């Protein structure tokens, strides 16, 4: 299923009833947990979170841990961005605006001091350079998939952040917090995708570090 996260549960139930395999790209944590519960009685394989993040970045991070006998930190970063950013946001909604709003507003699951905990989205900003390109990174929800459950007690720190062109996070905080758009997620998504529609020339940046 490549549908927005809020439509995936119905598709998953249909796959479960038909006894066929199910895959999706969702980043939504409650949706994922519901599908994993379905998988316990499914005849087919049910695998949510098979996209870029969660999905690919988790595979990269997990692979890197194979070179270590003891883990201190797993730091994962992903940015899907327009190659030629315009305006102050420097962004284009090349995938579900509902999903972007979701990951900007929901709490983020991380491991800190060896234990799973929740932290706010759009926080803990950092500067990062990818091949000389200046980007910012900040916490967003859902990017780790089920990695926290996998690595709890095995690593001191595990976190995921989204990368954007500098200044994006501050503007998004203003949009959601100061303008109270967090209270109307549907309208927020419509406004954002209308302002920053999809583009053909996009690029994905990935950064994974394991200590």
Residue ranges and their predicted role:
Residues 1-8:
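Rossmann-like NAD(P)-binding element
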Residues 67-211:
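C-terminal catalytic/substrate-binding lobe primarily of soluble NAD(P)-dependent oxidoreductases
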């Amino acid at each position: 299923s490549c549908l927005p996260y809020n439509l995936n549960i119905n598709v998953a139930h249909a796959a479960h009833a038909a006894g066929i395999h199910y895959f999706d790209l969702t980043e939504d944590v409650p949706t994922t947990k519901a599908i994993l519960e379905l998988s316990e009685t499914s005849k087919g394989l049910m695998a949510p979170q098979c996209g870029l993040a969660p999905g690919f970045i988790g595979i990269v991070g997990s692979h890197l841990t194979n070179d270590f006998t003891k883990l201190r930190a797993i730091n994962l970063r992903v940015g899907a961005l327009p190659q030629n950013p315009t305006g102050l946001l420097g962004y284009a909604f090349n995938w579900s605006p509902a999903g972007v709003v979701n990951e900007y507003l929901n709490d983020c699951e991380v491991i800190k001091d060896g234990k799973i905990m929740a932290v706010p989205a759009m926080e803990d900003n950092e500067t990062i350079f990818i091949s000389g390109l200046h980007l910012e990174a900040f916490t967003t929800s859902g990017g780790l998939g089920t990695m926290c459950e996998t690595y709890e007690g095995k690593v001191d720190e595990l976190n995921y952040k989204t990368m954007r062109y500098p200044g994006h996070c501050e503007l998004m905080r203003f949009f959601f917090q100061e303008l109270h758009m967090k209270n109307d997620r549907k309208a927020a998504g419509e406004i954002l995708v209308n302002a920053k529609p999809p583009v053909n020339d996009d690029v994905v940046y990935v950064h994974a570090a394991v200590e």
